[in-house]
């Protein structure tokens, strides 16, 4: 997934608001009450970034499959309509030339009708594909951009929190001016199942597992490294606030406190709806299989139609119609 400008529905609260204990919180709360710490915060954040990545991948695949099936179905329908039109034109020209050969003429008419029926069936399926790709083109590209921005923002926050978790357990030096916030490799913290309500699926039902539709992280006992929090504060203010169009607020008055709130339902709800438009890949696969099957039957009928024409040595009349039959 490509990194783009951060746009995240995140808000951060003042210190006084966060003195409320976990039992009184209106949202899913991860704090340092009763010995909790940043390790669990990383797990909750990583769950969100993984879920966004999964949504992005599935949305990208839905868009690609819709476009691919549309292109194939359109090509097949155009070919069938072209051959049917040529056959109809030729039939009207040669019917008078066949004289009393009513049996062959009836067969040609029957084959022509069969081709028309098959074209109509493929046309009906194509109309469904067309409606699906129209909806997908309208919704999914912009949803992919939003998902990528949210993913980028949450992944960056996760990375900077992980800097704290990974640091040596020792007091920070008094001077932190040269401290840099950098990546530290793979997360080695073990995460309990309760830290990822979205692990079994990113859907409305899973979002209900977040109390109040939100996640709040509140670490105030000094577990946060001042040396990491100062550049993090600068990073969020210079990058996130300048490009988030008001969706991100950061109030960081204490260098050793980490306070973060995410409107999980507001982030994922619209994305789930947008990525749910159009037909899913499994349905599209069945539709293109049906279209291909109808095309095979059409080709058989068309072959029978042309065989009668060639057997009666009427190719000269075909040339006169400028047909490619």
UniProtKB/Swiss-Prot annotation:
Keywords recorded for this protein, A-Z: Glycoprotein, Signal
Signal peptide location: 1-23
Entries under InterPro entries matching the protein: ESAG
Residues annotated as glycosylated: 72, 290, 313
Recorded superkingdom: Eukaryota
Function of the protein: Not known but may be related to activation of the variant surface glycoprotein genes.
Protein name as annotated: VSG expression site-associated protein 117A
Source organism of the structure: Trypanosoma brucei brucei
